[in-house]
Amino acid sequence: RTIPRRVLPLYREALSFLVTLLDSDPDSVGLWKLLLIFDALILAPESASESFRDAIKRRVALFRAGAWEPLISDELKGRSSGPQRDNQSLLDVGDPKLVSALRAEKALATRRSRSGASAALSAPANPKASKPGDLLRAFEKLNPQVGQPSLTADKAARRPLNPPEGELPAPIEFSVEEVMKRVRSSNKNSAGGLSGSDYQSLSAWLHEDDDLTRQLVLLLNRIAAGAVPPAIVGLLTAGRGVVIPKDEIGGLRPIVVGHILLRFVGSLALAKEAPAIRDFFLKPVPLQFGVGVQGGCELMAAAISSFLTLHPGAIDIGCDAQNAFNSWDRTRLWSPLERNFPGLCSFGRLLYGSSATILFAEEGVSGAASVSNNVGSRQGCSWGSFCYCLALHGPLSTLAGEFPDLLVLAYADDVHIVGPPARAVKAYNRWVELYESELQGNLRPDKSVCFAPGVPLEVVAATGLPVKSLECPSGMPVVHDGTRVLGAPVGSLPFQAQFASERVAEICADIETICLMPTLQHQNCLATGSTVHRINHLLRNIAGGELDPFAPVAAAYDRAVLSVPRRLAGMTALSGSTERLASLPGRLGGLGYTTWSQSADSEFLASYVHISHAFPSLFPGLARVYPSAHTLASADEARSVSQPALHAFNALARLVSRAPSVAEVVRRDAAKPIKQLQHAFTLALASADQEDLLLALVTASPHHPRAA
């Protein structure tokens, strides 16, 4: 919750009092504990007879006086069963879509969370209630333990942690400017951990560049250096366990919310080391695109597609590892971390050098339940993906070195092996060995996919790959028309169109649910602030402006999006000029209901320009599939190069015909990230549309107010 401005100075003064004491005695376990529960004591929910502001004022006075009993009593009273009562009341609602709409409304109204509201739209409306013990079993299943048998063929015991001992290299340090910049850009709706602190309260801690902020930066640097009393490490690494229903029949998805201080320091460290991290994973051979790589998904999908285009008869094996992030061997982390990122070693040892505890409450079970976490990535950790990718990089480099003729790529745990069938299958079998021996994990053929465009099933089966069939249900599925790479369709245009149709159907269903939300303002907020942006990833990976394959799905999407402002206006239909105005961005006087027809070319061209700029250094052998868009002189020339080149030429031509400045942006800003390119293209196009709309209004009605 946002701390009221009138009491913010009081709140920070009390915090400053505590931090000053801790600064003078940094090894005091008691002061560290008090810091970790500061927000839980001061910001606990207020009673019905008291405002939040008055509650903070009263608690700060109690805190300064050392009156712990009433403070703790306040905190305990705040632990009500509100969410359970709310869920119970929704059981009386018969329409599942209305239940989802009401939950989305509440997420916006009470938490101001568009991401939470968006998730509520497609969440199970009335999932089967869990039984006592279900949550514990779900967390235990997701958290294997050191010493237990691993998932490898020999069932070897999981190795102990074995963190580095003794003095470590000099730790990373952060400046006041770096810390304040990071906290201001953080997601204030991100959940807090066990301590009661979140990014909202952390922003209040670091509200301005003053003595308190400078002391807090020193404290954050102590955490980054691992200079924390041993008794506090377990409190910092403990996580709040939450289980989310994933279907209507009782399936559970356990998640963990880590401590905000560790998450913040971790994100600071990764941001500061971003250039080194990117170079490590991409040089001398580009292997890992899941950490620190701008447009990593688009680059990887384009590389796989380009390789298959240039090597007819090649296949792509997308590998799936069972419980990948939660089951890798942590001993494979220490050596590459110290060798390549010495400044991160101390913080890495703090995060992963000992067993962490996941605490959660289970309905029908008294007290708190707990599960240890000492294998794989810590859930709720901002370093989870980085550490997994770092441990994976050794065996991945070995595989790429042994098969230099193949394309071996990964996006976190999503590993792809591309090449001639016999070689690709041989590499896959080798990857199974490496993954088992190095990370103590296992691959699941039945969840992996072999994409074999133009390669008969018999040819794939002849390589020795266990192919899924009635006789071998646990074998690997083989597809021929297309595959999904990180949410991007790779394959034929009909496959891409079908993939897009399914994705659009999901978004349209959510738009229908949005229209059931009671408040019109919340409908507008969620639709324009979240839902219309969900199409962006798809449009960056398909040539959505090509009408032949995508016209039907584009029309369906645009109808659904524009139905929201039509219903908000209480009209059965909107005029063409009204629809154009509604689809303009807010900065240009519109409502922000961006349509497929407005954004498809901008999204695809931004992705293409980024890929064409990156490929010559990353994939020289594939770069000819993605020549610079502005160098293509004609459609015939582009067609002779590749299908992506033709689509980029067409998209650029369509954009330039409406907004000529796009051509200069393509030449000037090719090195910029995809999002910045897309925003530049979209703004140029929207500005041109705005001018055309104003001209049309003035022409139709010279006395129109906008004619002034």
What residues fall within each predicted segment?
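Surface-exposed loop/turn segments and immediately adjacent short secondary-structure elements
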Residues: 1-233, 237-240, 313-315
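Extended C-terminal regions of large enzymes
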Residues: 39-111, 117-124, 569, 573-708
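Conserved pre-catalytic core of RNA-dependent polymerases
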Residues: 162-382, 386, 390-394, 603
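Catalytic palm active-site di-aspartate
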Residues: 193, 238-241, 253, 269, ...
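Inter-domain linker/hinge segments that demarcate the starts of reverse transcriptase
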Residues: 213-226, 271-273, 300-309, 424-440, ...
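Catalytic palm subdomain of template-directed nucleic-acid polymerases
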Residues: 323-341, 408-411, 415-438, 456
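Basic, alpha-helical interaction scaffolds
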Residues: 403, 469-546, 607-614, 618-621
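Short, conserved micro-motifs composed of acidic
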Residues: 424, 442-481
